[in-house]
C-alpha cells in the first residue's frame, strides 16, 4: 500500500501536472513544447483549482477526505482534457525535429556549475532542517487536517475545538500539503520539511530560467551564467528571516514562500510575455490571460497578502501598458484577471 501511494504522488507530480500544463500551453506558440513552462502552467492550474474549491469546502465544514476526492476527480478530468488537446494538435500538425546549436565546452561547464548549485541547495534544504516558529501553526494545521479529517476547526496550538478560522482558511496552502500527505501516506511534518523543497525549489528555478531567458534577449548562451548569479544571491540571501531567499531555501512548506519565491516571479514572467505580445504582436493568446488569472488565484492560496499584492501588481502593469500603447482594450481582460484577488480581498476585509 505505501508503494502504491508513492506511485500516485509521482504520477501527480510528474505526469498529471505537466499533462494539464501542456494542454494550456498548446495555444501559446512560443511555449508549445517547453517542458519547464508546462510544469509551471500545470502547477498554477492545480493551485487555482484548489483555491477555488477548498475555500467554499472549508467554510461549509467539509472533510479533507471529501475535498481530496473532489479535487482528485477534477484533476484527472483536467489531465484528460489537456492530453486530448495535445493529441489532437499532434494529429493536425505533426511534430518536427527541432535542430539546436550544440553546446560549447564553456556552456557545458556553466550548466554543470548551475545544476550543481541547484543540487546543493536541494540537499541543504532537505538535510539541514530549519526550525521556525510559524511551523507551530502551518505544519500543525496540515497534521491536524490529516489526523482528524477536518479543516481549520481545531486550534493548532492546543488541539482544542474552535469556530472556523476564517482568516487563515482564505489561504489554504497547508490543506494542499495535507492533500499531498494523504495521497502519499507520508506524515505531514515529514512531507512539509523534506518533500516540499524538492517540489518548489526546482519549480522556482524553472521560473527564474524562463524569466532570465527573456531578460537576456533570448540568448541561450547567457542563461547558465544568469542562473549561477541567481543561485549566489539565494545561497547568501539569508540577511534576515523575512527575505524571499530565506523563504525559498528554508520555509518552502509555508504559503508565504509559495507567494514570494514562486508565484510573484511567475506573474512577472507572464506579464513580460503579455507586454511583448501587446506591444509588438498587438494581440495576446487567451491562454496567457487564463494563466495570469490562475496566478492570481495561486497568490491567494499562498497568503491572504497575495490577494492584495496581485491586483496591485496587475494594476501597475495596466497603467504602464496604457501609457505605452494608448489603448484601453487590453485593460478589460487584465481587470478580469484581477477579479479573484479583489473578491478575496473584500471577503477578508468583511470577515476580519
What are these language model-derived features?
Residues 310-336:
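Perimembrane helix-loop-helix junctions
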Residues 58, 287-306:
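Membrane-interface alpha helices of multi-pass inner-membrane proteins
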Residues 24-32, 83-93, 271-290, 322-332:
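Membrane-interface junctions at the ends of membrane-embedded or membrane-associated helices
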Residues 30-46, 111, 220-227, 284-291, ...:
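Membrane-interfacial loop-to-transmembrane alpha-helix junctions, especially the N-terminal start
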Residues 117-233, 243-251, 262:
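Active-site lumenal/periplasmic loops and adjacent helix-entry segments of GT-C-fold
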Residues 1-100, 341-349:
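Membrane-embedded, hydrophobic transmembrane alpha-helices
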Residues 16-17, 253-279:
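Specific aromatic-rich, kink-prone transmembrane helix
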Residues 107-133, 338-349:
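Transmembrane signal-anchor helices characteristic of membrane glycosylation enzymes that use polyprenol
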Amino acid at each position: 500500500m505505501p508503494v502504491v501511494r508513492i506511485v500516485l504522488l509521482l504520477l501527480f507530480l510528474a505526469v498529471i501536472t505537466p499533462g494539464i500544463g501542456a494542454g494550456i500551453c498548446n495555444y501559446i506558440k512560443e511555449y508549445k513544447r517547453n517542458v519547464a513552462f508546462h510544469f509551471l502552467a500545470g502547477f498554477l492550474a492545480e493551485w487555482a483549482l484548489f483555491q477555488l474549491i477548498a475555500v467554499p469546502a472549508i467554510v461549509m465544514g467539509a472533510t479533507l477526505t471529501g475535498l481530496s476526492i473532489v479535487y482528485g476527480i477534477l484533476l484527472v478530468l483536467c489531465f484528460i482534457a489537456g492530453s486530448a488537446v495535445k493529441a489532437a494538435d499532434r494529429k493536425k500538425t505533426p511534430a518536427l525535429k527541432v535542430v539546436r546549436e550544440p553546446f560549447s565546452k564553456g556552456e557545458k561547464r556553466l550548466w554543470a556549475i548551475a545544476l550543481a548549485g541547484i543540487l546543493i541547495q536541494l540537499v541543504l534544504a532537505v538535510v539541514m532542517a530549519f526550525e521556525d516558529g510559524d511551523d507551530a501553526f502551518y505544519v500543525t494545521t496540515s497534521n491536524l487536517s490529516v489526523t482528524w479529517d477536518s479543516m481549520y476547526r481545531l486550534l493548532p496550538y492546543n488541539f482544542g475545538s474552535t469556530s472556523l478560522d476564517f482568516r487563515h482558511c482564505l489561504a489554504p496552502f497547508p490543506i494542499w500539503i495535507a492533500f499531498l500527505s494523504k495521497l502519499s501516506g507520508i506524515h505531514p511534518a515529514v512531507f512539509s520539511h523534506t518533500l516540499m523543497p524538492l517540489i518548489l525549489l526546482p519549480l522556482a528555478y524553472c521560473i527564474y530560467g524562463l524569466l532570465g531567458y527573456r531578460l537576456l534577449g533570448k540568448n541561450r548562451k547567457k542563461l547558465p551564467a544568469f542562473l549561477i548569479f541567481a543561485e549566489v544571491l539565494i545561497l547568501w540571501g539569508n540577511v534576515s528571516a523575512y527575505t524571499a531567499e530565506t523563504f525559498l531555501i528554508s520555509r518552502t512548506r509555508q504559503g508565504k514562500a509559495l507567494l514570494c519565491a514562486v508565484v510573484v516571479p511567475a506573474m512577472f514572467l507572464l506579464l513580460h510575455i503579455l507586454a511583448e505580445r501587446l506591444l509588438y504582436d498587438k494581440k495576446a493568446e487567451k491562454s496567457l490571460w487564463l494563466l495570469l488569472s490562475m496566478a492570481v488565484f495561486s497568490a491567494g492560496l499562498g497568503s491572504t497578502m497575495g490577494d492584495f499584492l496581485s491586483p496591485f501588481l496587475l494594476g501597475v502593469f495596466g497603467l504602464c501598458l496604457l501609457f505605452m500603447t494608448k489603448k484601453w482594450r487590453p485593460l478589460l481582460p487584465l481587470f478580469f484577471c484581477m477579479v479573484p484577488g479583489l473578491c478575496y480581498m473584500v471577503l477578508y476585509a468583511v470577515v476580519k
